[in-house]
Amino acid sequence: MYTVSDIVSSKIESYCRTWRMELEDTNSILTGDKIVSASSTAQSTSLSDDIELGAVCSQSWNMTISDTETAFLGKEYDTYLYLVDYETSGILAGEKIPMGRFTCVKSKKSGGSVQLTMADRLYFSDKPYVPHIPMPNWNKAVEDDICRQLGLQNGNDYTEVRLLRDKNGRRLIDKNGKVLYSKYFYFKVSSLPKDVTMRQMLSYLASAQGQFGYVDRYGKYVRKWYGKSVKTLDNNTIDLPTLSERQNAIVGIICKVSDDETLSLGVTDTTQGRVLEFENPYMTESLLQSLWRRIGGFSWYTTELYHRLGDPRFDIGDVVTYTNGADSYDIPITNLGFTFDGGLSADISAVGLSVEEQL
């Protein structure tokens, strides 16, 4: 969740607010009065009904702009949202909230406006991966290489050696009682699967570490997994959510390493709960044990939620809490879509199996 000043935070949660959007490239700034409307899509899973290890999804914006003179196609823009200061008509507290760095991939003029589709650099990742580095090599080198080819900065920190902890903050220890550190996430990429794409390779590298990948607000490629709740939603700002009757709970994982090798941990009987199944030719027993200690038991409700007062501080993969006064529900944001037209609203969802599918 992005952090802002107290004055901006208070205004975000107020019904008395006006938003503006801004596009900025190296040569110009397209100001808010020309951006008529916009809508975004972002997700941490490529599946329609389940969370996913190793999902690497691009984010995008569709915009309507009252500017038919500018050539947008192929240009890269830093995108911002800001609140209007009613006293000065300027930017409240001088704070612009970065929403990402996007390339214009489609541009269509109609009347006095132009419709744009803006996407982050992962949009181009479905091309075959041709290494620009010697192979075999370490996973970090492969991830760096793909990011360079896509025009991204790798925002994942491999240099900081730190204790690994589970979702409750407990230290992770292997079966021999040895404390695990982040540096153990280095592993060798010995060869490449036939016709593998850059997106698929990033997916393998992410799922091996129990994460998904995306491009953050600053145009950097990062990985994460769902953590603790970052905010309790104000019931005055949302419509009543649609919630599944039962929780989804991860009880096991199954990884297909090759046609001849499959690794698993936990319960593999799908009638007992959610069993995450995925493929990764680089998975090892130690990597699987490490990621299982962090994601095993993770639970959530399938949720659809309309946030009337959209909050641009939320990031994909954040966890928010909904409470009805009696019960509280943690909601991992797997899908996040903003709608801007001077106001700002958001559709938030946590995908998962329906009640019928859980039986």
Regions found by a protein language model. Give the residues of each.
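Short secondary-structure boundary/capping segments within folded domains
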Residues: 51-55, 290-291, 347
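Intrinsically disordered, low-complexity segments enriched in Gly and acidic/Ser/Thr residues
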Residues: 281-299
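Charged- and aromatic-enriched interaction segments used to assemble
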Residues: 87, 91-93, 108-244
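Short amphipathic beta-strand/extended segments with alternating polar/hydrophobic composition
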Residues: 28-40, 94-103, 232-242, 266, ...
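Short amphipathic alpha-helical segments
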Residues: 138, 142, 197, 283, ...
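Acidic, low-complexity/disordered segments
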Residues: 1-20, 115-119, 125-127, 133, ...
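Assembly/oligomerization scaffold segments
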Residues: 1-134, 190-193, 202-210, 215, ...
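Intrinsically disordered, low-complexity terminal/linker regions enriched in Pro/Ser/Gly
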Residues: 9-34, 38, 134-170, 356-359
